[in-house]
């Protein structure tokens, strides 16, 4: 088992032994809306309809060069109409992990301090080299068929 060093004001742990990721919490909020910039976060924080914020997690990782960390939404927060944007933490990054969060509903939603907001999944990277080509082989069962190509249901 690979050990990854981290710094955080709380313990990172899996909910269940078989889980892929560890939960991270809202530690503070950065208001990126120009009208609200510089205002203090008041507990609980009300995220307005269509508002995007950056939720700081208080978590710093020391990833080995051949690892990455994926920031993924938690299903429970998604049920509330909160979109947690997928993100990647590269191995060379040593800053605080921040999660972009958007309220996609037409009503205000409360975010509590220390609320679980996302999960971190740490993966070993496979080394790849992208080679530019003039042609791409389209001879697969799918070919270039994109959105909706498998039908509605």
Report residues per predicted region.
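DUTPase catalytic domain/fold
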Residues: 1-153
């Amino acid at each position: 088992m690979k050990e990854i060093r981290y710094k955080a004001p709380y313990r990172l742990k899996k909910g269940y032994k078989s889980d892929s990721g560890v939960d991270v919490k809202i530690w503070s909020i950065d208001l990126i809306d120009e009208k609200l910039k510089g205002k203090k976060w008041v507990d609980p924080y009300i995220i307005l309809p269509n508002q995007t914020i950056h939720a700081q997690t208080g978590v710093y990782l020391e990833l080995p060069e051949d690892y990455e960390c994926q920031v993924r939404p938690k299903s429970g927060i998604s049920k509330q109409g909160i979109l947690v944007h997928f993100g990647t933490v590269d191995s060379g990054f040593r800053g605080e992990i921040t999660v972009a969060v958007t309220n996609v509903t037409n009503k205000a939603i409360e975010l509590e301090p220390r609320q679980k907001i996302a999960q971190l999944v740490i993966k070993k990277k496979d080394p790849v080299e992208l080679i530019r080509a003039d042609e791409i082989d389209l001879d697969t069962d799918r070919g270039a068929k994109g959105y909706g190509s498998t039908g509605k249901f």
